[in-house]
Regions:
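Short alpha-helix
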Residues: 136-151
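Conserved small/polar residues in nucleotide/adenosyl-binding loops
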Residues: 182-187
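A short acidic, Gly/Pro-enriched loop at the edge of an enzyme's catalytic core
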Residues: 65-74
Length: 188
């Protein structure tokens, strides 16, 4: 995204605040970030205060569809999975509306492979039942079709990071286990 201190970024899906804090600290950007999660809003609000970043980060508790204004850059990390197939058009129309002319956007999310996509839409699998209830993962081709048909956005770069996901999960698991050991009460 070539972030600079002149950028005002809109982040759709705050998560636990990692991106907003990183961008503010490392690049000096202004970030407006939104979540609909009470727990994440409370956690990130406290984090922003502790880090002294109230002047750089604006935290909203709003649905992304109600956002206004235009921004230099747009980021959405691991949120598109929650949007669902039926709302992808609206999601990208909203992204297009929020970006200034020549603005840049980075979306990172889990997609479904093309070969099984039609069946995926009609079935309930492990991911739809336990990970993202009520949603559907989307396919890259579907995203590209929606962008081309309904927005003025264009694809600049696409990267498949599948090969890194297993390693990421392993690192998360090890970190989780370390935290369990750290927080476990000592034996008596």
């Amino acid at each position: 995204l070539d972030l600079t201190s002149d950028d005002h970024i809109i982040e759709i899906g705050t998560g636990w605040g990692s991106f907003a804090l990183h961008a503010a600290k490392k690049y000096g950007c202004k970030i407006t970030t939104t979540t609909i999660s009470n727990r994440q809003h409370e956690y990130v609000s406290n984090l922003i205060k502790v880090e002294g970043l109230e002047e750089q980060i604006t935290l909203l508790k709003d649905d992304y569809r109600s956002l206004n204004g235009q921004y230099d850059k747009l980021v959405s990390i691991e949120m598109i999975e929650a949007v669902g197939y039926n709302f992808i058009q609206n999601f990208f129309e909203t992204c297009s509306r929020l970006l200034k002319p020549n603005g840049l956007m980075a979306i990172q999310g889990i997609t479904y492979h093309e070969q099984g996509f039609e069946n995926h839409l009609k079935s309930v699998d492990f991911i739809k039942k336990y990970i993202f209830p009520g949603s559907n993962l989307i396919s890259v081709n579907h995203v590209l079709s929606v962008i081309k048909s309904y927005t003025d956005l264009s694809l600049v770069h696409l990267e498949d990071i599948t090969k890194y996901y297993a390693e990421t999960l392993k690192l998360w698991r090890n970190k989780y286990k370390d935290c369990l050991l750290y927080t476990s009460p000592s034996p008596r």
